[in-house]
């Protein structure tokens, strides 16, 4: 699905479920990492995360679009458009939009760890940050520290 198809889908959902036209832009923003989508208050555009379409399919994307359209229409009407507002929660329930989207299943990359060992006594040190072993000595025996990996 490209941005033109997404725009058409958003306009169709807006007319069918809300009975109001969507007059702004809806597009994929590949920089979104943890959120399904966002409604931009200043421009009234809707940005959506393409990863949700890939991982969870079209039905999840439709739910996210409905959620963002709730923000959109309520904001333009001057009603409560925030998650905590009663108007927003009522409209979510009316159109069958989810309050939160399903979490993504993509694995987060593990942070690199550095392992050091004392040459004299064999004491191991695991660090999250690299260090210069020339500047440090073993805390147990004062021996030289060598980097393993």
From Swiss-Prot:
GO terms for molecular function: zinc ion binding. It is found in: Cytoplasm. One of its GO terms (cellular component) is cytoplasm. Keywords: Cytoplasm, Metal-binding, Zinc. Zn(2+) binds at residues 67, 71. Pfam families: SprT-like, Zn_ribbon_SprT. The active site is at 68. Its main location: cytoplasm. One of its GO terms (biological process) is response to stress. Residues 6-147 form the SprT-like domain. Binds 1 zinc ion. InterPro entries: SprT-like_domain (IPR006640), SprT_Zn_ribbon (IPR035240), Uncharacterised_SprT-like (IPR023524). Its cofactor is Zn(2+). Belongs to the SprT family. This is Protein SprT-like. It comes from Bacillus velezensis (strain DSM 23117 / BGSC 10A6 / LMG 26770 / FZB42) (Bacillus amyloliquefaciens subsp. plantarum).
